[in-house]
Amino acid sequence: MSPKTETKASVGFKAGVKDYRLTYYTPEYQTKDTDILAAFRVTPQPGVPPEEAGAAVAAESSTGTWTTVWTDGLTSLDRYKGRCYDIEPVPGEESQFIAYVAYPLDLFEEGSVTNLFTSIVGNVFGFKALRALRLEDLRIPPSYSKTFQGPPHGIQVERDKLNKYGRPLLGCTIKPKLGLSAKNYGRAVYECLRGGLDFTKDDENVNSQPFMRWRDRFVFCAEAINKAQAETGEIKGHYLNATAGTCEEMIKRAVFARELGVPIVMHDYLTGGFTANTSLAHYCRDNGLLLHIHRAMHAVIDRQRNHGMHFRVLAKALRMSGGDHIHAGTVVGKLEGERDVTLGFVDLLRDDFIEKDRSRGIYFTQDWVSMPGVMPVASGGIHVWHMPALTEIFGDDSVLQFGGGTLGHPWGNAPGAVANRVALEACVQARNEGRDLAREGNEVIREAAKWSAELAAACEIWKEIKFEFDAIDRL
């Protein structure tokens, strides 16, 4: 044995493989205020104890690897390692456990959602000792969240920019999502905004295709916004999708939107990536643009109950990375979303301080220390009959977005917008008068339809449309 080997051996190095739980399962550990905490739903392979599975997650998402290594002796593992500090069974699920893991703050680069996710979920999800793994929640300590800018502006600043208070905002996604020329697209934008909507929207996959290049779309939409504003006296906007193949091209599109004088741009934050999103959010704050976020691809990550990542984690990540709006499901429409779960992450988007509440899927108390809030956007398969429920569920600080529920009106786009605006104003007035929208909502809509032919026609066309499927994402 060489002197060098003897020296290493003398300080305790022993080659080989040992159980993760001997190092990374520490039930006696007291979490620190500066720790990032994670709740993982763990499904171990048969024969793997839950303590070993939880410790493996902590190890592989922090300092560990499959064998002991010489260089462990060159640093302080106790300072840098993740620790599985608690494990509890999942009620009603065989061989599933919630493993709680604490990560020291020094493991993560400041202001980088990209680095945070690369560490915590970047590699461990393919680990063979686990049949499945899902990240249910994260606790972001103030000492880390304060390293992020967060949303470019936030809810209150947006309301001040738009001069709109006391009600949800109304939007519409232009349909068909693909195939329209830029001029016809701009026409639809104008008609919807003139009819009473606050916003219209590019669909998530509208970027710069052969049938409609981005610059042409931006110009025609800006013209539509200006014309609708002049006719209605209200501030209007269209979510111009700046998502592109490179960050440089994305910023170029945002710069052109600013030069046109429009109030808001849009980004697909999951397909575009967190680094691109944070870059765009910084540009938007510096240049007075609101930022609408679409969550395209989220269901690939969050829909399965035992594997992936819950949307509440993606919502927290977006609040740190930056966005003024984000799509959040509807509860009542065509897209996935159970009520208590949805309201849990809606609060995580909007509020400053959110208490732990397992009945709504919130595993940790979260303190955002005055980071601006994000408006949830309810969009997907909704129409005028849903308006009372949406107003009651989401409250004023939200965007209610009707695509087919506007453009599918039998009389055209502008009447469809009128119908939605009348329905919303009726629901807000009824709520302010103390009426119970959950119980009296349909009657409120019927009463309003007596005074609005556009609303009456919408009520007739969509009276039988429902999306009654059980939610997959249940507590």
From Swiss-Prot:
UniProt cross-references to InterPro entries, sorted A to Z: RuBisCO, RuBisCo_large_chain_AS, RuBisCO_lsu_C, RuBisCO_lsu_C_sf, RuBisCO_lsu_fd_N, RuBisCO_lsu_N_sf, RuBisCO_lsuI
Compartments reported by the entry: Plastid, Chloroplast
GO cellular component assignments: chloroplast
Co-factor(s): Mg(2+)
Positions bearing N6,N6,N6-trimethyllysine: 14
Pfam families registered for this protein in UniProt: RuBisCO_large, RuBisCO_large_N
Enzyme Commission (EC) number: 4.1.1.39
Modification after translation: The disulfide bond which can form in the large chain dimeric partners within the hexadecamer appears to be associated with oxidative stress and protein turnover.
One annotated GO biological process: reductive pentose-phosphate cycle
Site (Transition state stabilizer): 334
EC top class named in words: lyase
Catalytic machinery residues: 175, 294
Residues excised as propeptide: 1-2
Keyword NADP: no
Modified residues (N-acetylproline): 3
Keyword Repressor appears in the UniProt entry: no
Binding partners and assembly: Heterohexadecamer of 8 large chains and 8 small chains; disulfide-linked. The disulfide link is formed within the large subunit homodimers.
HAMAP family, per database record: RuBisCO_L_type1
Function: RuBisCO catalyzes two reactions: the carboxylation of D-ribulose 1,5-bisphosphate, the primary event in carbon dioxide fixation, as well as the oxidative fragmentation of the pentose substrate in the photorespiration process. Both reactions occur simultaneously and in competition at the same active site.
Protein name (database record): Ribulose bisphosphate carboxylase large chain
Species of origin: Pinus krempfii (Krempf's pine)
Lineage start: Eukaryota, Viridiplantae, Streptophyta, Embryophyta, Tracheophyta
Gene: rbcL
